[in-house]
């Protein structure tokens, strides 16, 4: 019988059946195609292209003319397609019906690969051919001959994708054809030259539309898809994504308008809409039965190719570049070198990681599948080889295995067929469109042999285990030579035999039932929330333990035991810094911690400097955002806890020592208290003890009779005992008497010192008439004693102290003129001057002082002299040492309180209300003048503004700390000077006071206070100077910011005081509340008149 054409056969077949029903394989009559299928499977015949109306009875020889590529490209505009869920577009890879080659001989490169640049067809045996680089990129893959069978596409135990392509010429497909797979069959455009005349026959009625579509014998099935999306970073020459999308949409519209009316009849209900069609899928049948898919939709971006694939948490097997030194460079048509293409390999299935073997394991009987992503930048035309730049004939994908210990030894790869047979895997010819990503998936692969030394030893991996590496290489052919473009090799792989009893399951090896009931044994490391544990148990997150953590501590398991120095542990703990912190969000999400939880702890880098053995490196840590922390440090808090134990022990030792010392101090305190009580009792009985000691000392000493040599004088037996006791009692009595004597002498000495202080001190109290007061007036180099007698005409220079070893110098003066003490202010400008006496009035009432402030407000303050003057009734000679002669006790001033102190406080802010202790100074100390700044300079922390020197211009005398009323009134922001005025000075007048400072200050007059008034003569002028402001007794002339000249008006009173305040520059007055009181210094100048 004549063999019908495929199109005609299919058309007649579907016209005779109801396609609305279920077209099951059992319901299809395939008797019409039996003869055709049986003859087509022969590999020794070739079928030429014939029109659809021509039939032939015998196959044609291989020498028949084949398809010419030029004819296909010249008529590409007449493309026709059916609505099968996909459309053609610009640059789409189109299928070409293979035709016979010039000869049936094998190609020069592999035995089954024909790469001829001038031939656009596949050999009859169905091996891949090389694509011409001229014109539109075209993929053409033939169908390999298979014997008829009834096996399904995939083995039942395989999860791989269907191996057999959905072709019309596939006998198995014809038996299992359904309307669903028919809808996906698109007749590719056949734009060829007319067949030879002897093969032409009558055209069918619709031949006007079918003339370019010859028989579909040996056709390839291709599902058309949308154009692959562009890479994000393919280079500047790549068109933008929006322009590419616009071109794709335009070409889609053109192809839809060019569809021919005469198409295969398909039921409308079985048509798939364009929106329902699967996108991003391109299936091509290769010569050895592998599936080549182009699914760029699975590629997210360029970062996913480079970054996420290197993530250590990636689930699949890892790949690394292989033989990079042998990679060649590609060039475009203008001989410009193209950028390196993007090449990524991914193992979809077939490899499982074995924790016990620490490697990926592949069972030889199971399939493994590999997907390759190739991103081509530009259109390659040439390749640079050691022989020079050669034109590219084709690209192909090659898979093979190599041994890890010898990578030059290749392991062949096999591929399963539909009938479960295995054939060697041959390279896959590829067409790489420019500026696009091509996805190629090859499935049903097996290693041809297994690795060596796979047998386990005692349930553990064999130490002599051998490994394979799977190499996926992209190669290019030029002038019958192959060159490596890119290649990647996998991690080490163990390939095991198919006998499951030969190996134990990984689950059984890792997790086993323990020896005790309800126990499980695991061999290896465990990671919770992490896939790469570096310890026996690694937990990323919090751990909750309701019990206790136990640690080994048996002495029998320890050696080199040494006790630590707790002192060093305390020092290390004191150096550690405790901080509050939050973990970074990217780190917390990686290790399973709460991002907002606040933690308290230490810093590993700081602990590493103090306690290095408590810090350990745990390798690099990759966070969720891709950031890598190199040599991540962890802290052993158990080690720090033991440091705390040692530090606490050291603190306990220190506490015990302190308690011991406190107990000793308490015992000594009790003993001292008892001694004080005994001293007080002895001081009361010191007189009695002295008299007894005197009487005991007056008893005559009884000499013992001399001893006669060689003769013993007998005596009473009890006499020696009595004498021994008497001697002991005498010694004890002498010791007690001596102690009493020392205590009595000390007490008397202290009492005498106090009496002398009262006798020699003058504090400004009233002196009764007829008495003399001994007063010492100091000079810098001389101290002269004077006796001030009230109501007596005796001169000062005639009263001398009796018993002085050095009499005072004699001073000769006129009867009407008497020299005042050296520090007395004498305003007598034209001596001799008249005596102006302002006598002290004896009264029981305290003097009344009227204080004048800068606001002209007056208040009356009642003050009582703190200590009465001492009246010397008898002039008793007394020898005084130099220190005693150099002492001076000046009357205590009645100083007004500063305005910022409390009215009840009678002392300076830094002084205590205690009795002034008489301080001793030597003549050498007195010889050095002390300025008001001597005390403030001693305190470097004092920030007060003060003066450096005070000088009276009338007498050209410096006012120093010797003029202080007491040592406690000069310092800490308060200086009170007591200045005597001679009786020869008038009641009115002025004093010029020069104030100097080391830095600019502001000097303000605060207030004036005066005591009892004197009987002012009528001739005395007004005390106020007309040049001074009204209402004040002072006027100031500022010479410079550091020098001030004040004019003080004398007041007709027994004593009067001027109050000046030194403040920071810019102070408005004494009542300026914006000035800090700790920065001001108050100066009180108290003048009192000498009457007698």
Curated annotation (Swiss-Prot):
The keyword Transmembrane applies. Residues 681-695, 849-867, 928-945 have a biased composition (Polar residues). It comes from the Eukaryota. Residues 145-168, 187-210, 258-282, 681-714, 798-817, 849-945 are annotated as: Disordered. Residues 553-662 form the Peptidase S74 domain. It comes from Xenopus laevis (African clawed frog). Belongs to the MRF family. This is Myelin regulatory factor.
């Amino acid at each position: 019988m004549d063999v019908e054409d495929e199109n005609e056969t299919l058309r007649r077949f579907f016209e005779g059946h109801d396609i609305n029903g279920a077209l099951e394989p059992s319901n299809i009559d395939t008797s019409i195609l039996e003869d055709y299928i049986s003859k087509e499977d022969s590999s020794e015949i070739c079928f030429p292209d014939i029109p659809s109306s021509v039939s032939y009875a015998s196959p044609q020889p291989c020498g028949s003319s084949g398809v010419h590529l030029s004819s296909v490209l010249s008529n590409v505009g007449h493309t026709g397609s059916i609505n099968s869920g996909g459309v053609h577009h610009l640059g789409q890879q189109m299928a070409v019906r293979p035709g016979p080659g010039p000869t049936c001989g094998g190609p020069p490169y592999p035995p089954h690969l024909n790469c001829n640049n001038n031939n656009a067809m596949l050999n009859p045996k169905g091996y891949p051919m090389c694509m011409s680089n001229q014109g539109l990129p075209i993929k053409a893959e033939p169908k390999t001959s298979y014997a008829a069978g009834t096996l399904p596409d995939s083995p039942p135990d395989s999860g791989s994708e269907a191996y057999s392509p959905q072709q019309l010429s596939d006998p198995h497909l014809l038996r299992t054809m359904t309307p669903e797979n028919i809808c996906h069959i698109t007749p590719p455009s056949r734009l060829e030259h007319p067949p030879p005349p002897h093969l032409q026959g009558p055209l069918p009625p619709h031949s006007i539309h079918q003339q370019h579509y010859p028989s579909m014998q040996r056709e390839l099935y291709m599902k058309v898809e949308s154009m692959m999306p562009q890479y994000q970073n393919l280079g500047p020459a790549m068109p933008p994504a929006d322009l590419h999308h616009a071109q794709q949409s335009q070409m889609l519209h053109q192809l839809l308008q060019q569809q021919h009316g005469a198409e295969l009849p398909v039921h409308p209900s079985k048509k798939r809409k364009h929106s329902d069609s699967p996108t991003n899928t391109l299936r091509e049948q290769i010569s050895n039965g592998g599936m080549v898919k182009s699914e760029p939709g699975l590629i997210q971006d360029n970062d996913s190719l480079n970054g996420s694939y290197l993530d250590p948490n990636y689930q699949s097997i890892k790949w690394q570049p292989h033989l990079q030194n042998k990679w060649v460079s590609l060039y475009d048509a203008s001989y410009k070198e193209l950028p390196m293409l993007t090449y990524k390999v991914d193992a979809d299935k077939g490899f499982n990681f074995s924790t016990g073997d620490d490697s990926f394991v592949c069972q030889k009987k199971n399939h493994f599948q590999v997907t390759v992503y190739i991103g081509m930048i530009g259109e390659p035309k040439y390749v640079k080889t050691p022989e020079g730049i050669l034109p590219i004939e084709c690209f192909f994908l090659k898979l093979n295995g190599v041994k890890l210990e010898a990578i030059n030894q290749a392991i062949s790869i096999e591929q399963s067929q539909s009938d479960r047979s295995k054939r060697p895997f041959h390279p896959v010819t590829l067409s790489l469109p420019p500026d696009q990503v091509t996805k190629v998936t090859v499935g049903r692969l097996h290693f041809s042999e297994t690795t060596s030394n796979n047998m386990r030893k005692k349930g553990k991996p064999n130490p002599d285990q051998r490994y394979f590496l799977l190499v996926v290489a992209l190669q290019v052919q030029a002038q019958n030579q192959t060159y490596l473009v890119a290649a990647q090799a996998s991690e080490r792989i163990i390939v095991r035999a198919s006998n499951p009893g030969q190996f134990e399951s990984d689950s059984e090896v890792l997790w086993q039932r323990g020896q005790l009931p309800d126990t499980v044994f695991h061999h290896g490391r465990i990671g919770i929330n992490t896939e790469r544990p570096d310890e026996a148990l690694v937990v990323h997150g919090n751990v909750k333990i309701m019990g206790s953590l136990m640690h080994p501590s048996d002495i029998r398991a320890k050696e080199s035991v040494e006790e630590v120095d707790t002192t060093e542990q305390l020092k290390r703990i004191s150096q550690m810094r405790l901080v509050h912190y939050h973990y970074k969000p990217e780190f917390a999400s990686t290790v399973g911690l709460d991002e907002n939880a606040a933690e308290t702890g230490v810093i590993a880098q700081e602990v590493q400097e103090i306690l290095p053995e408590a810090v350990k490196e745990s390798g690099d840590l990759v966070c969720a955002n891709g950031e890598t922390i190199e040599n991540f440090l962890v802290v052993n808090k158990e080690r720090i806890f033991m440091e705390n134990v040692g530090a606490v022990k050291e603190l306990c030792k220190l506490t015990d020592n302190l308690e011991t010392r406190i107990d000793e101090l308490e015992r000594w305190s009790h003993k001292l208290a008892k001694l004080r009580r005994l001293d007080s009792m002895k001081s009361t009985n010191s007189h009695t003890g002295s008299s007894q000691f005197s009487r005991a000392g007056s008893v005559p000493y009884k000499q013992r009779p001399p001893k006669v040599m060689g003769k013993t004088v007998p005596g009473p037996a009890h006499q020696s005992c009595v004498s021994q006791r008497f001697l002991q009692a005498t010694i004890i009595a002498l010791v007690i008497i001596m102690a009493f004597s020392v205590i009595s002498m000390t007490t008397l000495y202290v009492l005498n010192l106090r009496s002398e202080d009262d006798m020699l001190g003058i504090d400004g109290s009233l002196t009764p008439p007829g008495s003399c007061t001994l007063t010492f007036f100091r000079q810098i180099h001389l101290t002269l004693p004077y006796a001030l007698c009230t109501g007596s005409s005796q001169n000062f220079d005639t009263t001398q102290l009796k018993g002085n070893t050095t009499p005072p110098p004699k001073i000769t003066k006129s009867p009407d003129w008497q020299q005042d003490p050296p520090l007395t202010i004498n305003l007598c400008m034209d001596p001799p001057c008249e005596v102006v006496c302002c006598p002290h009035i004896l009264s029981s009432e305290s003097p009344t002082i009227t204080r004048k402030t800068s606001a002209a407000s007056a208040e009356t303050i009642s003050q009582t002299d703190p200590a009465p003057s001492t009246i010397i009734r008898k002039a008793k000679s007394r020898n005084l040492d130099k220190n005693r002669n150099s002492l001076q006790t000046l009357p205590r001033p009645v100083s007004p309180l500063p305005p910022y102190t409390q009215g009840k406080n009678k002392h300076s802010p830094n002084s205590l209300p205690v009795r002034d202790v008489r301080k001793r100074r030597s003549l050498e100390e007195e010889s050095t003048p002390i300025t008001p700044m001597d005390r403030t300079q001693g305190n470097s922390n004092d920030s007060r503004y003060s003066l450096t020197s005070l000088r009276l211009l009338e007498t050209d005398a410096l006012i120093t700390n010797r003029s202080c009323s007491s040592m406690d009134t000069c310092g800490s922001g308060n200086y009170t000077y007591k200045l005597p005025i001679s009786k020869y000075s008038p009641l009115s007048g002025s004093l010029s006071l020069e104030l100097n400072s080391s830095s600019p200050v502001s000097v303000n007059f605060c207030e004036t206070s005066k005591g009892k008034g004197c009987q002012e003569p009528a001739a005395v002028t007004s005390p106020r100077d007309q040049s001074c402001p009204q209402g004040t007794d002072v006027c100031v002339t500022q010479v410079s910011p550091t020098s001030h000249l004040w004019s003080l008006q004398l007041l007709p009173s027994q004593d009067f005081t001027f109050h000046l305040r030194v403040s920071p520059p810019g102070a408005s007055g004494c009542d300026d509340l914006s000035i800090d009181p700790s920065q001001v210094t108050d100066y009180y100048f108290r003048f009192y008149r000498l009457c007698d």
